[in-house]
Amino acid sequence: MWCLLRGLGRPGALARGALGQQQSLGARALASAGSESRDEYSYVVVGAGSAGCVLAGRLTEDPAERVLLLEAGPKDVLAGSKRLSWKIHMPAALVANLCDDRYNWCYHTEVQRGLDGRVLYWPRGRVWGGSSSLNAMVYVRGHAEDYERWQRQGARGWDYAHCLPYFRKAQGHELGASRYRGADGPLRVSRGKTNHPLHCAFLEATQQAGYPLTEDMNGFQQEGFGWMDMTIHEGKRWSAACAYLHPALSRTNLKAEAETLVSRVLFEGTRAVGVEYVKNGQSHRAYASKEVILSGGAINSPQLLMLSGIGNADDLKKLGIPVVCHLPGVGQNLQDHLEIYIQQACTRPITLHSAQKPLRKVCIGLEWLWKFTGEGATAHLETGGFIRSQPGVPHPDIQFHFLPSQVIDHGRVPTQQEAYQVHVGPMRGTSVGWLKLRSANPQDHPVIQPNYLSTETDIEDFRLCVKLTREIFAQEALAPFRGKELQPGSHIQSDKEIDAFVRAKADSAYHPSCTCKMGQPSDPTAVVDPQTRVLGVENLRVVDASIMPSMVSGNLNAPTIMIAEKAADIIKGQPALWDKDVPVYKPRTLATQR
């Protein structure tokens, strides 16, 4: 029926036509495989990232289900030790992996016309835990209205009432349970607690500028500024692998592989039956009696669908890939958060500049290795906030992260002086991009085209980001620390100058999403239905950030884990959790911006 909706005739006709070659190849391959012992599981999960780790943990709670988890990258521990894998597990060492291709796909975009022709670097996790093993450990759920919007966009059953219980189920917050927080979940969450004087001064400055202080931006009131929640536990990064995968490894019904690249999904007609993968240079096959589940993320999941014959038929044929199902939404609807750094010199030697000098780094590292304490035990992005950019905006559309340091080129260039900065950017940009296969070779990175700043609305929103940040930085609370403005610089004042600065300096916040959009079967851009099943085929799901219909207002790790928790219940046939009429803050008036 789905292929008929796509205008390609009956599924049977498609199988005899465009699928003929695929079926004959598949039949020969399956016949050949039949002569060998079949490596069969209930579920094959591709990708041990934020979502895949959740699925591995939850699906193997039933001892009758056998699960194979395949990850292209290495394990996140060396010889079972987090200390030996300090680059991953020491929170302050997060920049160490941003350019390390042992743990990172190291993607790059195409040339961005809206960013002065620049090519942007996109680090993505390629390790157990995925990007939750590389990210800044900020735990942000987004706004309740994001999930109401998903419902309106066709993701029925994914409104806030049906998502909040899964946020709670996943979360083990150090502050205990509430209507909004979970206390007993596997994902350990703590509140920023260094009380660095610059963090305190920043929060005071935001209040002097007229913004509220929120005690829990993941609870009743996202709007305002406050201390951030972090996926840090006892001084160590708490990734999805720490939360879900490692506790499940002792189960006999879970097999978790590392350094294993899946090259395609295997089909019998339009039914997914397994995957083909490469390990140690050898090709292997694994079969799923129930389902194959893709959890590779917003780049790898659509890439694997297309390599397997699911995507835009014309594009696949050009690369010689047999078409299983014409699904033109695959790889489309690419969305990402873009951000800019506003940097200010600090007149006092209290920033993290000295902590990045060689001898001091050694001391910090030794303390962390010994006790998991000290400056190595935090990511330092401990305060931030969410505000509305202008009157009439119903809920926050700008996000701030404050850092008592200076970041240059993704941290690849050492800091040059005592300075502090804000990472700021719009959360619901209107520029939408796409990704496509570069070739039929699974090892080739896809073509990534985010189309950053391709709308006038987006550049106007960034203009507001710069102006509103400058207003906060000018408040009295920061006067004792305020030196000259380093970026954009006091000479940048007019709208035209600000726009030029943004186009020259804006960079990705590392939040790609929405490339396998969830929606109704009648939506020609949808890839999966609200049960996470790939449209037009059987026994195949996608569960990760790629299925978001649209971006959430914040970081993506917490929502991705929520998606996987909810999907696990769907897959197991459990009744959906829901919590009706949970109060959510609304401004008293929209006539003012704050």
Swiss-Prot record:
Record PTM N6-succinyllysine, positions in chain: K436, K484, K496
Cofactor: FAD
Reaction catalysed by this enzyme: choline + A = betaine aldehyde + AH2
UniProt GO MF annotations: choline dehydrogenase activity; flavin adenine dinucleotide binding
Residues the record lists as binding FAD: 42-71
Alphabetic keyword roster: Acetylation, FAD, Flavoprotein, Membrane, Mitochondrion, Mitochondrion inner membrane, Oxidoreductase, Transit peptide
Locations listed in the record: Mitochondrion inner membrane
Record's GO cellular component terms: mitochondrial inner membrane; mitochondrion
Pfam short name (any one): GMC_oxred_N
GO BP, sorted A to Z: choline catabolic process; glycine betaine biosynthetic process from choline
Oxidoreductase recorded as keyword: yes
E.C. code: 1.1.99.1
Feature: transit peptide: 1-29
Residues the record marks as active site: H511
PANTHER family, per database record: CHOLINE DEHYDROGENASE, MITOCHONDRIAL, GLUCOSE-METHANOL-CHOLINE GMC OXIDOREDUCTASE
NCBIfam families on file: PRK02106.1
Record family assignment: Belongs to the GMC oxidoreductase family.
Record's protein name: Choline dehydrogenase, mitochondrial
